[in-house]
């Protein structure tokens, strides 16, 4: 447990001092617990999401960094994207089978920025309605169905 807390403290400082572009740690979210963070995000300039504001929820288990964090969009504005379900779940391989303890909150944030920035058309995943009706509340317990090369 102590190594998890040390790692989270280190990542928290890194996110506060050098956040990825368009990302800001919601300071209130970490006041009561170091195991649940909210990161405020703004869509990158020149993309379909330019100026849009989103929130990412990170939840860390006691096995972090050996287990990936649970990461999902939360709040009023969930991006419309082929790999983001309307309940906020994100289909991104580094959040599941491609996770490595060498990855960090910053690398997850950068991957999500990249995923949104490369989007050519705002649309939901093809199975959005079915998935949202039948999925587990924890996206880490999802067996993802791949619709293209990445998800």
Swiss-Prot record:
Domain UBC core residue range list: 3-151
Entries under CDD domains matching the protein: UBCc_UBE2W
Entry EC no(s): 2.3.2.23, 2.3.2.25
Location relative to the cell: Nucleus
A GO molecular function held by the record: ubiquitin protein ligase binding
Keyword set, alphabetical order: ATP-binding, DNA damage, DNA repair, Nucleotide-binding, Nucleus, Transferase, Ubl conjugation, Ubl conjugation pathway
Catalytic activity: S-ubiquitinyl-[E1 ubiquitin-activating enzyme]-L-cysteine + [E2 ubiquitin-conjugating enzyme]-L-cysteine = [E1 ubiquitin-activating enzyme]-L-cysteine + S-ubiquitinyl-[E2 ubiquitin-conjugating enzyme]-L-cysteine; S-ubiquitinyl-[E1 ubiquitin-activating enzyme]-L-cysteine + [acceptor protein]-N-terminal-amino acid = [E1 ubiquitin-activating enzyme]-L-cysteine + N-terminal-ubiquitinyl-[acceptor protein]
Coiled coil: none
Main location: nucleus
InterPro entries for the chain: Ub_conjugating_enzyme (IPR050113), UBQ-conjugat_E2_core (IPR000608), UBQ-conjugating_enzyme/RWD (IPR016135)
Post-translational changes noted in the entry: Autoubiquitinated at Met-1.
Active-site residues, Swiss-Prot/TrEMBL: 91 (glycyl thioester intermediate)
PANTHER family linked: UBIQUITIN-CONJUGATING ENZYME E2
Function as written in the Swiss-Prot or TrEMBL entry: Accepts ubiquitin from the E1 complex and catalyzes its covalent attachment to other proteins. Specifically monoubiquitinates the N-terminus of various substrates, including ATXN3, MAPT/TAU, POLR2H/RPB8 and STUB1/CHIP, by recognizing backbone atoms of disordered N-termini. Involved in degradation of misfolded chaperone substrates by mediating monoubiquitination of STUB1/CHIP, leading to recruitment of ATXN3 to monoubiquitinated STUB1/CHIP, and restriction of the length of ubiquitin chain attached to STUB1/CHIP substrates by ATXN3.
Family: Belongs to the ubiquitin-conjugating enzyme family.
Protein name: Ubiquitin-conjugating enzyme E2 W
Organism: Mus musculus
